[in-house]
Amino acid sequence: MLQNIRIVLVETSHTGNMGSVARAMKTMGLTNLWLVNPLVKPDSQAIALAAGASDVIGNAHIVDTLDEALAGCSLVVGTSARSRTLPWPMLDPRECGLKSVAEAANTPVALVFGRERVGLTNEELQKCHYHVAIAANPEYSSLNLAMAVQVIAYEVRMAWLATQENGEQVEHEETPYPLVDDLERFYGHLEQTLLATGFIRENHPGQVMNKLRRLFTRARPESQELNILRGILASIEQQNKGNKA
């Protein structure tokens, strides 16, 4: 089940951080590392700092875009500070661990970490169902990348161990929630429909789509509910075409 949990690093700029992250992951039983458009490729320094976790580096998935790293996932959590222009559903690390383990029993989960200096962009954070913030010392809250991964990975392991110690049988069943790919298609469909009806203007959607993303992220519709919403959009499109005919 832990293999279903992806640690996703976005545009990492130091190979040493890749190695340190791999070490942090493996100590907690995580091995599924994804590197999104890394500014440098893993090298001997990454292997050295991995300190026995070189297999995690060697098996890392290297992709060009965040969408590729999130494909097939039903839950995405991004690391972020709380002060954002557009508030988002928040988790603390413990809640993140519990949710990740519960969902990873059936489908892949992505835990996304941003660039060393600037973290994740707002656009990247909007692709996440939740944001997770580590309650560090407010007078000195500077965690490096590997430290942040270690904190989250520890909580994932504690949540997983609890299921083992309690003798809980993790049920493998079809997840009720849509994959990230399906959600992105829905958002594209929604934007096209709103453009066609004149509700938003092309190239000037403003904050409307961002707020709608937040609304549906907060509601987190199940797959069948998302299909209903897609059906409603298709009906509106059909009606709109009929009115223009």
Curated annotation (Swiss-Prot):
Highest taxon listed in the record's lineage: Bacteria
Cellular compartment(s): Cytoplasm
Catalytic reaction list: cytidine(32) in tRNA + S-adenosyl-L-methionine = 2'-O-methylcytidine(32) in tRNA + S-adenosyl-L-homocysteine + H(+); uridine(32) in tRNA + S-adenosyl-L-methionine = 2'-O-methyluridine(32) in tRNA + S-adenosyl-L-homocysteine + H(+)
GO terms, biological process: tRNA nucleoside ribose methylation
Any one Gene Ontology molecular-function term assigned to this protein's record: tRNA (cytidine(32)/uridine(32)-2'-O)-methyltransferase activity
Binding residues annotated for S-adenosyl-L-methionine, in chain numbering: T79, S80, A81, G114, I134, S141, S142, L143
PANTHER family from the UniProt entry: TRNA (CYTIDINE_URIDINE-2'-O-)-METHYLTRANSFERASE TRMJ, TRNA/RRNA METHYLTRANSFERASE
Name of the protein this chain belongs to: tRNA (cytidine/uridine-2'-O-)-methyltransferase TrmJ
Gene that encodes the chain: trmJ
